[in-house]
Amino acid sequence: MNPTLKLAAALVAGLVAAQAGAGDADIRHGRYLVATSGCNDCHTPGYMMKDGDVAESEWLTGDVMGWQGPWGTTYPANLRLLFKDMDEKTWLARARAPMRPPMPSPSLRAMRDADLKAIYRYVKSLPVKGAPAPAYVPPGGKVATPYFDLTPKNLPPMAGK
């Protein structure tokens, strides 16, 4: 192989390795954000009740435990299934859009694009697993699953209302 070809091959190999390393760093950062931002609290079955002692192989597979409040009853999506056919641009738009409670939409909207992309890349790195979450139930609808009741009770009257 001539010297110019060797140099070109070495440069290409270095670029590929650098890109792979950057991808791995994004995935590690995404895992960190998922672990520290509370994503597992709702999107991983049993995570809160087991004080986080859930294998990573079960993370972000959604849950049948609902969250009920004045908005109705919502369920944490199986993010692995959700992201399966979603591109990064769609994820960024969805993360910036309002979502039903108790999803902390303001927290997602406050994240930098780089952080949201890292979360996306981490979730995409996980094998697709699990079933879709149950469908949203509007206020007053029949709920067939266990759920947490987040309906405010005994609130004092609001000033000016």
Regions found by a protein language model. Give the residues of each.
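A structural feature that tracks compact, well-ordered secondary-structure segments
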Residues: 80-82, 93-94, 106-107
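Electrostatic cytochrome c docking/interface patches
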Residues: 18-35, 47-51, 88
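Solvent-exposed, polar/charged alpha-helical surfaces in well-ordered, non-transmembrane soluble domains
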Residues: 28-32, 40, 77, 89, ...
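Flexible coil segments in periplasmic/lumen-exposed cytochrome c-class electron-transfer proteins
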Residues: 36, 44-74, 105-161
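Peptidoglycan-targeting cell-wall enzymes and recognition modules
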Residues: 72-87
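Short, solvent-exposed loop/turn segments at the edges of secondary structure
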Residues: 1, 72-74, 98
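Bacterial N-terminal signal peptides that target proteins for export
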Residues: 1-9
